[in-house]
Amino acid sequence: MKMNINKACDLKSISVFPPNLRRSAEPQASQQLRSQQSQQSFSQGPSSSQRGCGGFSQMTQSSIDELLINDQRFSSQERDLSLKKVSSCLPPINHKREDSQLVASRSSSGLSRRWSSASIGESKSQISEELEQRFGMMETSLSRFGMMLDSIQSDIMQANRGTKEVFLETERIQQKLTLQDTSLQQLRKEQADSKASLDGGVKFILEEFSKDPNQEKLQKILQMLTTIPEQVETALQKIQREICHTFTREIQVLASLRTPEPRVRVPTAPQVKAKENLPEQRGQAAKVLTSLKMPEPRVQVPAAPQAKENFPEQRGPVAKSNSFCNTTLKTKQPQFPRNPNDASARAVKPYLSPKIQVGCWKTVKPEKSNFKKRATRKPVKSESTRTQFEQCSVVIDSDEEDIDGGFSCLINENTRGTNFEWDAEKETERILRTARRTKRKFGNPIIIN
């Protein structure tokens, strides 16, 4: 806090002592020293006032002591001056004697002779002047002392105000601190309550879990869940084994079906309907296919004896692969209208054209001599009037059912003048459809992680 000190106590604004011509140089020096000391005391006054009332009391006591000392000095100096004046008024003594003799002579001589009326009047006037000067000095010192007291009082008042303000601020700070202490205590209490509630809740939950009768069931369920992955692994291994066994069996069956059988041409029966061409009359391979719901994908018609050497079964495996993959249709097949909603298109018509004679297969193995004789007995017909037969093989490797308006089958022609009749083409369509369906069913890969 800043304390404004009254400037009236400045010594420069105070009037100077009246001039004293008769005063010697020593009292002037003493006055200067006294003024300097008073200025120092006033300059030190604010700092001492800031420190406290103890400093003010010390300063006042020191100033009073200095004033008393100065008064004593002035009184002693004035006495000396008065004695000197009195001695100057007396006649000079020319005789040089010791001090004891002078004192004895002074005491012995009468004072009445030496004092005159004029000297007494002058001494009175001088004494009165000196007294007036002393009274004036006392007044000035008292006035200065009063001004010092006034300045000290103002400083004390300011210090009291500052202390009051500080006290008020400290009281406010104490109130704030008390509020903060109360809030902290409330927070601590709330924390303790929350901890106690949480501990109680946790204990209650643990007790409920411990008292739960379904704990054994939960343990059993956990054990079952832990055993589930092992069971799944064992089941997957079993399924893999079964799938491998089934695939191997099916592959073996397909390989056995694809192996060629010995085929012998048999004389055809006249005017046989398509219903008589049952799977029981087609051989053992057809029976296996019907039992597995996988019809034979080959359509074979008995060929003339001249084309016997062109059979793919007699050429070996290389000729078979070439006949299946490398040859394509040389003649355009007739396009048949296909209606999926029409049931007559799916079934084979029971009637045949009267000009065609279709025979059925029989498991008869005649001797070679008889076959040669029969071949020689038959006359050779011209190309225009001979019976038209064909040895063809159909490939079912592709899934596309419509290429250029027909089926994606490959036919290996071995004779001239081949011609498909209406009922034979429909039968091949039906066989191809069933074969592709079965292939799609069994051909989809099964991925097991």
Swiss-Prot record:
GO BP annotation list: chromosome organization involved in meiotic cell cycle; embryo sac development; meiotic DNA double-strand break formation; microsporogenesis
Keyword Isomerase part of the UniProt annotation: no
Location in or out of the cell: Nucleus
Record's GO cellular component terms: nucleus
Residue ranges crossing the lipid bilayer per the database entry: none
Biased composition (Low complexity): 28-50
Keyword annotations of the record: Meiosis, Nucleus
Assembly information from the UniProt record: Interacts with PRD1; this interaction facilitates a binding to DFO.
Function as written in the Swiss-Prot or TrEMBL entry: Involved in DNA cleavage that forms the double-strand breaks (DSB) that initiate meiotic recombination.
Name of the protein in question: Putative recombination initiation defects 3
Native source species: Arabidopsis thaliana
Gene: PRD3
